[in-house]
């Protein structure tokens, strides 16, 4: 028996298919400009984008001279994502989450550490995690995401753990973005 297909998520599956070049072209060469990395902009222009993805010649996006067109299965994935939304609500996407308490950094063996937070999800079927956004000298940058259940489930607040094990390296702090803002968390 084949496994059920994963519901496409804008930030995980759709946005990464739009390269920096695609974004630059669509924000400078198209009127009105479309920011291909912005959920609301892509949703507002979804029909035009799909027409361009299916198009040929100068209507094709991305153009043949710049690495296009998309493979058919990418277009199918975009269409599957479109089916997860409505005129009122954009397709399936992540939301910034809020931890129930402070972020915790636990020392493990040697230089290993574990970042964790508890999040109360609105229903069963949700997922939470820390997305690693960047690593620079002295810090690691994260975003705390919640993926809502799809299809939506009845309200049933459920505590979930977001965890990221990591090697401390030279990191003195973690910078975590969540629904309440940006937080500096010291690494012990």
What are the residue ranges of the model-derived segments?
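Mature extracytoplasmic domains of secretory-pathway proteins
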Residues: 111-151
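Residues at beta-strand starts and edge strands
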Residues: 8, 111-115, 138-140, 156-158, ...
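Intrinsically disordered, low-complexity linker/tail regions enriched in polar/charged residues
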Residues: 101, 149-150, 187-188
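Aromatic- and Gly/Pro-enriched helix-to-coil junctions and flexible linker segments
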Residues: 1-92
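Transition segment at domain starts
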Residues: 91-120
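An anionic, turn-rich surface loop/hairpin at beta-sheet edges
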Residues: 140-170
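Glycine-centered tight beta-turn/hairpin loop motif at sheet-sheet or coil-to-beta transitions
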Residues: 100, 123, 178-181
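A short amphipathic beta-strand at an alpha->beta junction
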Residues: 158-188
């Amino acid at each position: 028996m084949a496994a059920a297909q994963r519901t496409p998520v804008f930030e995980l599956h759709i946005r990464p298919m739009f390269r920096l070049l695609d974004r630059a072209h669509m924000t400078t060469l198209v009127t009105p400009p479309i920011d291909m990395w912005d959920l609301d902009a892509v949703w507002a222009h979804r029909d035009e984008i799909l027409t361009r993805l299916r198009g040929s010649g100068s209507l094709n996006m991305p153009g043949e001279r710049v690495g296009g067109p998309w493979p058919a299965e990418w277009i199918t994935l975009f269409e599957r994502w479109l089916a997860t939304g409505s005129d009122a609500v954009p397709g399936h996407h992540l939301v910034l989450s809020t931890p129930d308490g402070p972020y915790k950094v636990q020392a493990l063996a040697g230089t290993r550490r574990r970042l964790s937070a508890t999040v109360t999800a609105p229903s069963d079927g949700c997922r939470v995690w820390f997305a690693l956004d960047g690593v620079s000298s002295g810090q690691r940058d994260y975003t705390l995401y919640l993926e809502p259940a799809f299809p939506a489930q009845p309200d049933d607040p459920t505590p979930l753990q977001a965890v990221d094990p990591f090697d401390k390296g030279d990191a003195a702090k973690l910078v975590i973005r969540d629904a309440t803002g940006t937080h500096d968390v010291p690494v012990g």
